[in-house]
């Protein structure tokens, strides 16, 4: 039965497109700049899911290593902290919150609601960036995750390593990413 949704929608973009996204001058549109920054942060952190970025805490970063648990699987991941990640974090004021990124900003409002609203806003703005760049697929936060996996595979990184890096429960899940 065809549900109207194709199982594997092409979501990955090549490294040259990632570079175009990174290098786009968005100084005149802070909201597009913010969306791009979160997209790039995801890419730099092995395609970290938006929900995981939202709940990253400042205390998760210690001695040059970011340690967090995937919301979806509970798997603990370790990521070496790199300069481009720090540059994004430094751009935004998150004082008054325990969070590393400016996604959950108001400590008196439901965190899940804020994350959902931010995800919607960011994906809406990423689609706009994608249209600006003339991309054939809608640009969303998910594209960063798929792109990281595909680019890693193109660099001959073993699927087992890509799978572990993405916090997948099985290599079968990673293979679905790499097929799309």
Map each language-model feature to its residues.
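C-terminal catalytic core of tyrosine-transesterase DNA break-rejoin enzymes
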Residues: 40, 44, 48-52, 145-169, ...
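Active-site/catalytic core of tyrosine-dependent DNA strand-transfer enzymes
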Residues: 12-19, 82-136
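Short, basic (Lys/Arg/His-rich) helix/loop patches that form interaction surfaces
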Residues: 23-30, 123-164
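Short, contiguous acidic/charged loop-to-helix segments that flank catalytic cores in large enzymes
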Residues: 26-30, 67-78, 109-118, 136-143
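Catalytic-site neighborhood detector that most strongly recognizes the C-terminal catalytic loop/helix
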Residues: 4, 70-74, 166-180
